[in-house]
Structures are given as C-alpha cells and as structure tokens.
C-alpha cells in the first residue's frame, strides 16, 4: 500500500528523524567520553548498579535520556497522526495478508495470553506496546531507520541475525519473537526449501 504523506507530515517526520540521529551521533559520544574518563572510579568488575550510579553523574547522560524519551514521543505522535487519517484503508490492507497468491500465511491465536510483564510496560515507550495497536508493525518499520541512523535501511540487522546461524540443511526453522519478521524473511531467502515459522505475542 502506498501510504499518503503530505509535505508538512514529511517535513515533521524528517525533522524528528534528524533529532534521533543527533541523539546517537551528538549526545552519544559525549556519554562515551564521560564513561571513559570516569571509569577509573569503578572497580575492575563493576556491576550494573555501580555503573548506573556513575553515569547518573553525567549531564550528557541525563540530558540524553530526556532527549531520547521526548523524541520518541514526537516520532510516535507523527507516525500515528499519518496512519490515523488513513486508518480504515491501512487496516483493510493489513487484513489482506492471507489472500490467495501470497507467500506464507498468518495465524492468530486468541487464546494466547499476553504476559503481565509484557502487557504493562510500553516497550520503547511505543503507545499500546507491540500488541495493543493495529499499527505496531508499521510504527516499528518507520522508526527503526531513524533510530539506527539509517544503518538498517536494507534490513541489515535481520540479515546479520539470520547469517549468524551456522549454515545447514534445515527442514524447519522457528523464529521466536519474530516481531515484524526482520529475521524471518531472511531465513526464507537463505533456506527456501525449509518451513519457516515466526512466533510473536503481538499481531503484525
């Protein structure tokens, strides 16, 4: 589906994407510098609590956490605003996943209960988490590029995961926690003769 985006919406998306990039390339290095300069205060094998206490002394770290949290909120607001205007058309398109001629199929099990620890926390502050919104997959897909400074525009992360599996004559492959299928699809390309299953709590 060709999702329609106005010039104003595209400009806002590009602006928020740029902020995400600045968080990684501008603020991130300042956090690294602080840690490298101050880690001498830690013991040889610091635990997470000790490292957290040290980093909480860093202005860059505290500002970076504030900056990223609010930038995420702006990105979700932007993407949801675009999708909500075309909600019926987008959902109708998503519901065509099992039409004749499609590669593979989707089966949803309404008996599966979402675990409390998963249901009660909005992972990456995504509204509705990954299971509570019909647009969860699209939001992830649109956000991963800016979040990774466009280092995943060709699904490099999914391919790295799939290529990390020792090569073999696999008959069946199960991708646990498949999300939107970033590694599931590469498995299909790498092992075209195998049966590939992707399993996730959330609908795609």
Name the predicted role of every residue range.
Residues 2-46:
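Intrinsically disordered, low-complexity terminal regions of plant proteins
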Residues 144, 175, 200:
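Acidic active-site catalytic centers that drive phospho-/nucleotidyl reactions
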Residues 44-131:
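N-terminal auxiliary segments of SAM/dcSAM-dependent transferases
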Residues 184-204:
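Class I SAM-dependent methyltransferase SAM/SAH-binding core
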Residues 152-169:
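Conserved alpha-helix/loop element of class I SAM-dependent methyltransferases that forms part
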Residues 170-179:
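Conserved class I S-adenosyl-L-methionine
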Residues 136-155:
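Class I SAM-dependent methyltransferase Rossmann-like catalytic core
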